[in-house]
């Protein structure tokens, strides 16, 4: 998918990223790709070294993060195979390192609007029929929800459910990088009559891999070279 692709191994103050980083180009634009679960999908969501991944991208000069993900649907109208570009998240994670605050540094980052509006707009234009907006409930994983939990998430206003957006999104904001996500619905969560299985998720993902690649190939050349959002100044009012 990438022109002139090369693999780069990096170390960070937080340990190693999930895997080697692929550097390459699409449509004349340079980019870096980190498979958050590892190339062999051998890292569980709660074990991903999110800080190392985001630190590495920032060190490489990345200014924007487009994050594909697989999600379950909490709404009947968001059927499997649908793209969703969420606008909010709910954090139900418990054990993850969610900030670069350390060694006396305290970052009170604002995530009132957690996704870059400029990047979301370009992503929606490229995606065409993607669902615009919605709340992503991020759970700890790797297990799926109970029916009671799924009902709770629906009652709380969540529209989709996944395991990786938090703390990836807020770390990107602390790193002053734009962040937007395109989520592929793979299943209806446990609230539906038939409970989700890993086999079902993988089958739907496999059916949509090429669609996601095509979307990224269309999107990346259209991203403005200069940022007009405020993401690059996210720390200005976040520290005392």
From Swiss-Prot:
The keyword Ribonucleoprotein does not apply. The record marks 145, 198 as: Important for substrate specificity. SUPFAM superfamilies: Purine and uridine phosphorylases. It catalyses: S-methyl-5'-thioadenosine + phosphate = 5-(methylsulfanyl)-alpha-D-ribose 1-phosphate + adenine. It comes from Cenarchaeum symbiosum (strain A). Keywords: Glycosyltransferase, Purine salvage, Transferase. Its EC number is 2.4.2.28. This is S-methyl-5'-thioadenosine phosphorylase. Substrate binds at residues 163, 187-189. GO terms for biological process: L-methionine salvage from methylthioadenosine; purine ribonucleoside salvage. It is an enzyme of class 2 (transferase). InterPro entries: MTAP, Nucleoside_phosphorylase_d, Nucleoside_phosphorylase_sf, Purine_phosphorylase-2_CS. GO terms for molecular function: S-methyl-5-thioadenosine phosphorylase activity. The lineage of its organism: Archaea, Nitrososphaerota, Candidatus Cenarchaeales, Candidatus Cenarchaeaceae, Candidatus Cenarchaeum. It holds the Pfam family PNP_UDP_1. Homohexamer. Dimer of a homotrimer.
């Amino acid at each position: 998918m990438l022109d002139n692709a090369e693999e780069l191994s990096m170390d960070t103050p937080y340990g190693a990223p999930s895997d080697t980083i692929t550097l390459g180009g699409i449509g004349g634009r340079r980019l870096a790709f980190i498979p958050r679960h590892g190339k062999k999908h051998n890292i569980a969501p709660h074990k991903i070294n999110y800080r190392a991944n985001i630190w590495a991208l920032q060190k490489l000069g990345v200014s924007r993060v487009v994050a594909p993900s697989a999600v379950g649907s909490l709404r009947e109208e968001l059927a499997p195979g649908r793209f969703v570009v969420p606008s909010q998240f709910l954090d139900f994670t418990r054990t993850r390192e969610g900030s670069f605050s350390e060694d006396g540094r305290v970052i009170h980052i604002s995530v009132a609007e957690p996704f870059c509006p400029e990047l979301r707009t370009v992503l929606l234009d490229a995606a065409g029929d993607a669902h615009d907006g919605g709340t992503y409930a991020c759970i700890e994983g790797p297990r799926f929800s109970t029916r009671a939990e799924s009902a709770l998430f629906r009652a709380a206003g969540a529209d989709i459910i996944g395991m990786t957006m938090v703390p990836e999104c807020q770390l990107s904001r602390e790193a002053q990088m734009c962040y937007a996500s395109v989520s592929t619905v793979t299943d209806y969560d446990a609230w539906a009559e038939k409970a989700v299985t890993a086999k079902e998720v993988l089958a739907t993902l496999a059916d949509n891999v090429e669609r996601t690649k095509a979307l990224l190939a269309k999107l990346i050349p259209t991203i403005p070279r200069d940022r007009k959002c405020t993401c690059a100044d996210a720390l200005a009012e976040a520290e005392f």
